[in-house]
A protein has these predicted regions:
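Condensing-enzyme catalytic core mediating Claisen C-C bond formation in acyl metabolism
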Residues: 47-126, 130-133
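Conserved catalytic cysteine-centered active-site region
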Residues: 1-6, 15, 38-64, 150-168
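Active-site/binding-pocket entry motifs
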Residues: 42, 96-97, 140
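Active-site-proximal alpha-helical scaffold in enzymes
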Residues: 1-25, 64-85
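Short glycine/threonine-rich loop-to-helix capping motif typified by GTGT followed
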Residues: 101-110, 139-156
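Conserved beta-ketoacyl condensing-enzyme motif
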Residues: 10, 24-35, 128-146
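Beta-strand segments within the central parallel beta-sheet cores of soluble alpha/beta enzyme folds
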Residues: 16-24, 86-94, 129-136, 163-168
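Short, well-ordered, mixed-charge alpha-helical segments that flank or form enzyme active sites
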Residues: 2-3, 27-31, 100
Length: 168
């Protein structure tokens, strides 16, 4: 996600008209599986993999490890219109944070996630009331779920229960 945000800023600053951005991760290595297993962060519901990862569920027991990659082509709006491109979405803001709280657990108050959301809202020049959906990390771990839920409550206040939240 950081690469996408940085690519959008490069375009916004006028340093490029088009950028390809994204990333890849391969965590399902012996070291990755062993580390997450030792941290008790992996779901043990191997008998029902479709329901194993359940962020924010009271019966959650961890996440399902997977690998993935994704790439996007970002293009300056007028440049895209000029060439007749089909425009799928507009990235209006980007935010990030890094709190270095703990190697695997966020602070309970979700300060880092709340700061990233606040930074994205500020960058976009919009209010939290204009947001209807949050794509969260959703690790299905007690510490991660609690921190993310608190971050959403911090940013959206009383409206937090009306904002749709899911995870990748």
């Amino acid at each position: 996600v950081h690469n996408i945000g940085h690519a959008a800023r490069i375009i916004a600053y006028g340093d490029a008209d088009v950028m390809v951005a994204g990333g890849a991760e391969k965590a399902s290595t012996p070291l990755g599986v062993g580390g997450f297993g030792a941290a008790r962060a992996l779901s043990t519901r191997n008998d029902n993999p479709q329901a194993a990862s359940r962020p924010w569920d009271k019966e959650r027991d961890g996440f399902v490890l997977g690998d993935g990659a994704g790439m996007l082509v970002l293009e300056e709006y007028e440049h895209a219109k000029k060439r007749g491109a089909k425009i799928y979405a507009e990235l209006v803001g980007f935010g990030m944070s890094s709190d270095a709280y703990h190697m695997t657990s966020p602070p309970e108050n979700g300060a880092g996630a709340a700061l990233a959301m606040a930074n994205a809202l500020r960058d976009a020049g919009i209010e939290a009331s204009q947001i209807g959906y949050v794509n969260a990390h959703g690790t299905s771990t007690p510490a991660g779920d609690k921190a993310e839920a608190q971050a959403v409550k911090t940013i959206f206040g009383e409206a937090a229960s009306r904002v749709l939240v899911s995870s990748t």
